[in-house]
Amino acid sequence: MSAGKAERTRPKRALGQNFLVDPNIQRKIVRELDPRPTDVVLEVGPGHGELSQYLVGRCRRLVLVEKDRDLAGGLRARWGDRADVDVVEGDALRIGLSEFVRDAAAVRVVSNVPYNITSPLVFAFLELEPAASRIVLTVQREVAERIVAPPGIKAYGALSVGVQAIAVASFAFRVGRQAFRPVPAVDSAVVRLEPRPDAAGVDRASLRTLTRACFNRRRKQLQKTLRTAPELSFAGDVEAVLGRLSIDPAVRPEMLDPPTFVRLAAALRAGKEGGASR
């Protein structure tokens, strides 16, 4: 079957499928990704190949990960005879994405992210080994605003800190709902993430626990959250820890920037480990 005549399947609501059908937006996303001939490009949720058609032949290898069996079959029918295209049928959150880019010298990721799994999928991309040099995602506009939000505004939260602690996050452009079929109930946006070279030193599990505890109590003073949040289980001297980091004990979590959260998470973990060893 030719690329231009691939059989199209109906969107499946259970899988959160909304296909990007606007060719102008498709090309803008590919320009944002800016694939190089030496890259391995990982595309998750390629659908009918709306973006893939612009990526085939532009990178060393294109890995298409599609959960929907019918869509995966259509992708194999279009490009299965190409040595530089791999079609992987499976759930991106379960199959271990790093296995498909392990031999890559350079990795880029692109995805039209299903709204119901946005956060776990974003972090799965950020935890790839080897790390991606660029990640371009189409997400719900509200989520895009949370990803790039600075401290001190309502949109700033655990997702903002978790992403910005390990990547430079940029709002690329808005995507109207009419660019998709079926038409979703909300607008979307494209964000660009570029992982930081020093991100390997971030204790992501401790950071995630800390930010969730803090932003679940975002209007409380930081010192009170650190003392009382059961998920933190920190029995050390909170004021001493905050003093060493030059953090005001009365500050609210929404005012702390991501690097400060990273330092605080590391200090709390060190404090707990030190207490356990005595």
Task: Name every feature range the model reports, one short phrase each.
Residues 1-213, 243, 254, 263-278:
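Catalytic cores of RNA-modifying enzymes
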